[in-house]
């Protein structure tokens, strides 16, 4: 598992407006953590394209990602999950999409570089 990979994950149970259920997630944790930690940091992905209106929303192309339809990574919906929640590998985002994801994480966390 590497940063930029997409998996289906079981995100239930949830509270309030959290994204839940069996859904695609984007691995955003660094590869050292991915190798040694029992947990992984992910961002929820939705296929509701109308959601791509915030600076923390990044469009993901279905052609490159392996997703069944074009989708949106929700970088305000980042959470740490146990690796056992990851189910099926889907694919990867492109390098240019991952660069946009990294910028959206900076926006989400208020990091200025």
Annotate each language-model stretch with its function:
Residues 1-113:
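Conserved functional hotspots at enzyme active or ligand-binding sites that engage polyanionic ligands
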């Amino acid at each position: 598992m590497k940063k930029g990979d997409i998996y289906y994950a079981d995100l239930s149970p949830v509270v309030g407006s959290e994204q839940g259920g069996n859904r695609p997630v984007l691995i955003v944790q660094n590869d050292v953590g991915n190798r040694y930690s029992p947990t992984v940091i992910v961002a929820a992905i939705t296929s509701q394209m109308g959601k791509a209106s915030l600076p923390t929303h990044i469009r993901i192309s279905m052609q490159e990602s392996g997703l069944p339809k074009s989708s949106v990574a929700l970088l305000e919906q980042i959470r740490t999950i146990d690796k056992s929640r990851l189910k099926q590998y889907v694919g990867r985002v492109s390098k240019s999409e991952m660069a946009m994801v990294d910028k959206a994480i900076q926006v989400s966390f208020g990091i200025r570089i």
